[in-house]
């Protein structure tokens, strides 16, 4: 299986308030109000995993996104400031597909992986499966990968797709 490690910000669509180069992390994105995303990929990306070691700075929620088909269509594996970990589907409006309790702390690194395989969506923490769901209601079948931040800042050194 091929793995691609992305560290070059020029390969990304940016729909975010701030993505500055003055920080040590190549990916340090801030969305002041609402949800902002950065992503790469195309409609040939179907079944894959996206992984990253993410650090969250005072966000309402944030995490990884997969099968991105624009700003309003994607799956997300997110942590929230309300101590939840969830798999969500953005299909013009945000739908929480599954949510579990999660002991979340700001300014802490989390190794997350979001895996999409047909209608099955799985979330991993430190390579351990911790949440999964099947989307049977108009599933997203293809699209790019990236990260999402809601009302705050998240950062990472790289995003891996395999």
Give the positions of each predicted feature.
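Short, small-residue-biased leader/transition segments that mark boundaries at the very start
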Residues: 1-6
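Generic beta-strand structural signal
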Residues: 21, 79-81, 116-118
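Secretory/extracellular carbohydrate-interaction modules
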Residues: 29-95
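Carbohydrate-binding surfaces in secreted/extracellular proteins
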Residues: 52, 106-134
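Short, aromatic/His-centered strand-loop micro-motif at the edge of beta-sheets
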Residues: 91-113
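Extracellular beta-strand elements of beta-rich domains used
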Residues: 114, 157-161
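Flexible glycan-contacting loops in extracellular carbohydrate-active proteins
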Residues: 133-158
